[in-house]
Amino acid sequence: MLEVISTSGFSSFQDMGRNGFRSQGISRSGAADYYALFEGAALLDQNPNSTALELIGNGGKFRVLQDCMVALTGAIMPASLDQKPLSWNSSHYLHGGSILELGAPQNGRYSYLHLRGGFKAPKIFNSSSAQPSAGIGKYTRPKDILEPLEKIPEALKCQTIEPVDRFESTSCRLVESFQTHLFTPKTIKKFVDTEFSIDNQSNRGGIKLTHTGSGFSTSNQLKIMSDMIIPGDIQMTGSGQPFVLLSDCQTMGGYPRIGCIIPPDLPAIAQLKTGRTVKFKFISRDEANRIASKDRKCLEIIKERCLEPIRDPQKMADLLNFNLIDGAVWAKN
């Protein structure tokens, strides 16, 4: 159990999101980086849909109210327990009364704090994912008490995990959308040849892409009938400005979509920090299905990426959790 001492103001509970409510205008939401949920679940031996705390900006400061076990995944943050460093992509025991501090993300946008048993959060439309802009859930605030959904007494070894490679990506794969044909072959070629930069006007709803040169327009761009949209769609505004839609995107949109990023590449582009660059490549639906199948198999065996950590005793904040035996041994030649 944890108490929030300080936070960036944009941290919220997230799971794998809500499905089946798009027709009612309810966004999917869910973690921007679903790989991080699977990694945290593997470290804590629990369901990947367990609710985690998604951290945006400075992670925050937390008081440990009761002994618990946590895992840290996603974009790497400087982490410490009572001012002693904690390793990232790892699980840790926290003793009651200690202070957990998490800094600013270093190699991405979204970091995740997982609690053994999952965080307790209200289920709204079959999900604990918060979307405060839609009146669903809230951001965490100082003095909030973060409790486990389940209290799991059995001991579990601390582990580390080799994260899925997604933080150095410079390209994303996409498939044609229902509206790709509205763009001329010349415009599509220009799009895939262009290097885009991540703009600072980006959030959980979408990423604004900037580039040099004119926009990417279609004929009758502002007269297209609104249609269903999903995370991964790349919309072009009236000025031809591209936006990549993410977890909190709306359910309907009228801007034309030049393509849709395949799900396995969405965490990578979501994690790109402001100023990073990216290019896009169209692939066939058959290839996209093969990649998705490989991704599912990778996640099914993700626990195989877990290892017992090699740790420096001088830097172990949880050293007292281990039995250290001292004594003498007599041996006869």
Give the predicted meaning of each segment.
Residues 1-333:
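Conserved "landmark" site that anchors the functional core of diverse proteins
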